[in-house]
Amino acid sequence: MTQDEMKKAAGWAALKYVVPGTIVGVGTGSTVNHFIDALATMKDEIKGAVSSSVASTERLKGFGITVYDLNEIDALSVYVDGADEINGTRDMIKGGGAALTREKIVAAVADKFICIIDNTKTVDVLGTFPLPVEVIPMAREYVAREIRKLGGNPVWREGVVTDNGNHILDVKGMAITDAKGLEVQLNAIVGTVTNGLFAHRGADVVLIGTPDGVITQ
């Protein structure tokens, strides 16, 4: 089974967590694209979706699925999204696709967070994948200096502007053993919008696509 086939298996497995008649929270990325394809097969059974990115919104609308603004609703039964890395306690690094802020907002609203990944995303210690930090453009260099004081090596993701109009710093060289603590530390730096650590709001269920099928954790 190829990596993309494992992603597809995880994406389709998430369908069983979709509650008929509700609005579904939808994340961003290649694995989520498979979930959107699956969701389209039951589009008449759901009320619609809330999306964490422009790209996912366009894909959902392409299937005729109604996409709501998050401000129009007060609850989400489920949010389905991928991860760039996830550890054994379901702390995650997300934001490789630069949608981390909207992803974190939608995840906060949802009753249940379903993380869909292939088996290359599981790690013992977070940090091999660079940690994205979304920053206000004028604060980029200040935030970078503060991150260096914490032991990280921030690299500006040049040419990338988030859906919110901000910049991304990818922080390398950190073995993250206290994800909750670092999430708070980074968010406390003035000029930071948010960072890609999902530790305070981690996944409730993890669906892992493997060569032998989907594992649920």
Swiss-Prot record:
Pathway assigned to this chain's UniProt record: Carbohydrate degradation; pentose phosphate pathway; D-ribose 5-phosphate from D-ribulose 5-phosphate (non-oxidative stage): step 1/1
Lineage, top ranks: Bacteria, Pseudomonadati, Pseudomonadota, Gammaproteobacteria, Aeromonadales
Catalytic activity: aldehydo-D-ribose 5-phosphate = D-ribulose 5-phosphate
One of the record's GO cellular component terms: cytosol
Disulfide bonds: none
GO MF entries: ribose-5-phosphate isomerase activity
Enzyme class: isomerase
HAMAP family xrefs: Rib_5P_isom_A
Name assigned to this protein: Ribose-5-phosphate isomerase A
Superkingdom, natural source: Bacteria
Pfam family, one: Rib_5-P_isom_A
Family to which the UniProt record says this protein belongs: Belongs to the ribose 5-phosphate isomerase family.
Keyword Kinase: no
Binding site residues for substrate: 28-31, 81-84, 94-97, 121
UniProtKB keywords: Isomerase
Physiological role: Catalyzes the reversible conversion of ribose-5-phosphate to ribulose 5-phosphate.
GO annotation (BP), single: pentose-phosphate shunt, non-oxidative branch
